Amino acid sequence: MVSKIRTFGWVQNPGKFENLKRVVQVFDRNSKVHNEVKNIKIPTLVKESKIQKELVAIMNQHDLIYTYKELVGTGTSIRSEAPCDAIIQATIADQGNKKGYIDNWSSDGFLRWAHALGFIEYINKSDSFVITDVGLAYSKSADGSAIEKEILIEAISSYPPAIRILTLLEDGQHLTKFDLGKNLGFSGESGFTSLPEGILLDTLANAMPKDKGEIRNNWEGSSDKYARMIGGWLDKLGLVKQGKKEFIIPTLGKPDNKEFISHAFKITGEGLKVLRRAKGSTKFTRVPKRVYWEMLATNLTDKEYVRTRRALILEILIKAGSLKIEQIQDNLKKLGFDEVIETIENDIKGLINTGIFIEIKGRFYQLKDHILQFVIPNRGVTKQLVKSELEEKKSELRHKLKYVPHEYIELIEIARNSTQDRILEMKVMEFFMKVYGYRGKHLGGSRKPDGAIYTVGSPIDYGVIVDTKAYSGGYNLPIGQADEMQRYVEENQTRNKHINPNEWWKVYPSSVTEFKFLFVSGHFKGNYKAQLTRLNHITNCNGAVLSVEELLIGGEMIKAGTLTLEEVRRKFNNGEINF
């Protein structure tokens, strides 16, 4: 059993094919790069004598099999100050060649890329890598040659996420990384997040000019990053064309804004040819796809369980012709995975969104792809795979939510991850507007609440000042955050631009005269009720807290017609809202 649970198949960082080739060539003892790294780069860049000698000795072996640590190395808390201590680090120069080497995080990205395209193979038992036949052919191909490009296109054709991107672009639309990201991978979990494009564009339209570059370049979910990187590779191979996409955004009390998103893509004629071949819809044989157990979940707490469940679903489909969903459920149960049908449907949707062609006809599912053999690690020898409480909760919600899109179940995980604050606030605001039917705006940023929503056409139209918090251990509403909300409530009451020049309260139309405040998080603990009561006494405004689970359940009831926004208004009683 391996000591680490690696994640492969999804790449966010590297984009230069010339650097990818250098990484592959360190596995080819006859390449110039191998000798350069062994004889020049490592002796020059690796300052620790013991590590330097070990790496050179490893590269002198007859059979070049490198461990993950030998390739990627280690890091420090300050990434820019980490010393060079691994083969890939020494193989690629950093941007601007200031240090002469890259860090371990970037090295991991290049390793994943080489593995994703099938140039190297992972040996699970020893946590190591070896070059493949196609990797050796790529290493030996002349730089910039037709053969090199042919090898790259063949490799990308067997990489499911690349084919997924081409499939989404197939009808000729000009799609942004957000359009692509929301339909890529296993939406509904924190490893595959996508920012709501409409809310991002609205934020751009209302942002200060100095902040727009930061929003365009750095505001994205993990799936958006994957889409951006894959789109960049496809662009370099001539399979898609990248070009900015422009939008006209209405803004309150101002002329319409023209905004753009830089990372947007359209398929080319060459791309359509590659896609037709991948689908087996030409005279050529369908290109086999490489799928790895390690790509079937990324950031989940119980990713071993979920990866294995999804891998087994794929194996069941490989062995069968056409199966009903209930038959897949029965087969899974025999293998020790007792799952509701909605979870299996969600997994199959994720496999499709990963780039695997599965045909759905009514209740029948049929795999249309040729999948190369892949390994499901036997990790249950000492540890039985059991669903976590979180996975049980998600499974329960998939069964309950008939009207709410299941992609929003990801809020359950996102709300527990403090690094995902921005995604949480944007997704929550999108949910309030798309599912509940509130009007409003995502605000965020300095001296603004996360969002402002309001009703139109209710018996009593009301507005809500919204603050969201992603917190791992439950949110106790500390006094600092309560004081911040007090400030927003009072700013909305006085509406004095000398106190806050950004005038965020202009979101609310003059017809809205009753206001509430709301905190949204994963779950609440501690003395939050006392803070809500204190805020109510100071501001004479009623508020509440709302867990993301209750947010989802309330949305389901709204869509089912069993709850109205007026009934939601009456639940603001300075406590926790439960539906």
Curated annotation (Swiss-Prot):
Keywords: DNA-binding, Endonuclease, Hydrolase, Magnesium, Nuclease, Restriction system
GO molecular function: DNA binding; type II site-specific deoxyribonuclease activity
Catalytic residues of the enzyme: D450, D467, K469
Enzyme Commission number, as recorded: 3.1.21.4
Reaction catalysis annotation: Endonucleolytic cleavage of DNA to give specific double-stranded fragments with terminal 5'-phosphates
Cofactor dependency: Mg(2+)
Industrial or biotech use: Adding the endonuclease domain C-terminal to different DNA recognition domains from other enzymes allows generation of novel restriction enzymes that are used to genetically engineer eukaryotic cells.
InterPro entries, per database record: FokI_cleavage_dom (IPR015334), FokI_D1 (IPR004234), FokI_D2 (IPR004233), FokI_D3 (IPR031655), FokI_dom_1_2 (IPR044945), Restrct_endonuc-II-like (IPR011335), WH-like_DNA-bd_sf (IPR036388), WH_DNA-bd_sf (IPR036390)
An annotated GO BP: DNA restriction-modification system
Disulphides: none
Pfam families attached to this UniProt entry: FokI_cleav_dom, FokI_D1, FokI_D3, FokI_dom_2
Written domain comment of the UniProt record: Has an N-terminal DNA recognition domain (approximately residues 1-292) joined to an endonuclease domain (residues 389-583) by a flexible linker.
Assembly and oligomerization: Monomer, in which form it can cleave DNA. Homodimer when bound to DNA.
Protein name (database record): Type II restriction enzyme FokI
Species: Planomicrobium okeanokoites (Planococcus okeanokoites)
Gene responsible for this protein: fokIR
